[in-house]
Regions:
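Active-site-adjacent loop/helix segments that line or gate small-molecule/cofactor pockets in enzymes
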Residues: 1-14, 74
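Short, acidic, Ser/Thr-enriched surface-loop or helix-capping motifs
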Residues: 20-21
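Residue-level signal for well-ordered, solvent-exposed loop/turn and beta-edge residues enriched
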Residues: 24-25, 179
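Glycine-rich loop-to-alpha-helix module at the N-terminal edge of alpha/beta enzyme cores
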Residues: 25-109
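PLP-dependent aspartate aminotransferase-fold enzymes
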Residues: 73-167
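Short acidic, glycine-rich surface-loop motifs adjacent to enzyme active sites
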Residues: 164-179
Length: 194
């Protein structure tokens, strides 16, 4: 089991509320892993998704897609970055997987530092960087990841000093491992070292 399964079946949502199969109403502070942060059934979201599904539901990224280009331009403008690269993917696991691979391509190293209790996804490398042996298959156990206690700056600095670290991956607000926050001093130490 990746997540604890709660005895509730959510069947519909509107705004910041969801309802279960017995029509009990809940204030949704979870948002499906924070994926639906705009609220459930937002009219603009429904209109845009419906319009796109009436045109084309999916196609490979091996061809040009003006929507991706427009999105990249809008994202770059909103973020204040004029010179950047964007790789559109489907999930956080894929984002983490590709970030770790890019780091390894860049520096040729393989060792990753991750935090105890962290969850980074279920793809091959992301699951290896996830601190949950129950979902880590033998093929994922490559000893490339060193798990350190979150916010243990001394242990982090000691590991970085070895000079063989490819990447550091931090879940700033741990969800699955409990609601644990990376503190400011720790994040500043990570930024300085990296």
């Amino acid at each position: 089991d990746v997540f604890p399964l709660y005895d509730v079946e959510i069947v519909r949502g509107r705004g910041c509320n969801v309802w279960d199969a017995d029509d009990n109403k809940y204030l949704d502070l979870y948002g499906g892993h924070a994926v639906i942060s705009i609220g459930h059934c937002h009219p603009h979201y429904i209109e845009c998704v419906s319009r796109q599904l009436n045109r084309l539901g999916f196609y490979s990224n091996s061809v040009q897609n003006h929507l991706q280009t427009e999105f990249a331009e809008r994202l770059g403008k909103a973020s204040g970055y004029e010179d950047y690269s964007l790789f559109l993917i489907n999930s956080g696991a894929e984002a983490n997987e590709n970030a770790l691979k890019l780091a390894s391509f860049y520096n040729g190293r393989t060792r990753v530092i991750a935090s105890a209790g962290a969850f980074h996804g279920r793809t091959s490398l992301a699951v290896e960087a996830t601190d949950n042996p129950k979902i880590n298959a033998p093929i994922n156990k490559n000893s490339h990841v060193t798990f350190l206690p979150l916010n243990d700056t001394e242990a982090f600095v000691s590991e970085i000093a070895k000079g063989d670290v490819c990447a550091v991956i931090v879940e700033c607000i741990q969800g699955v491992g409990g609601i644990h926050l990376a503190n400011k001093a720790f994040m500043q130490a990570v930024r300085k070292a990296c």
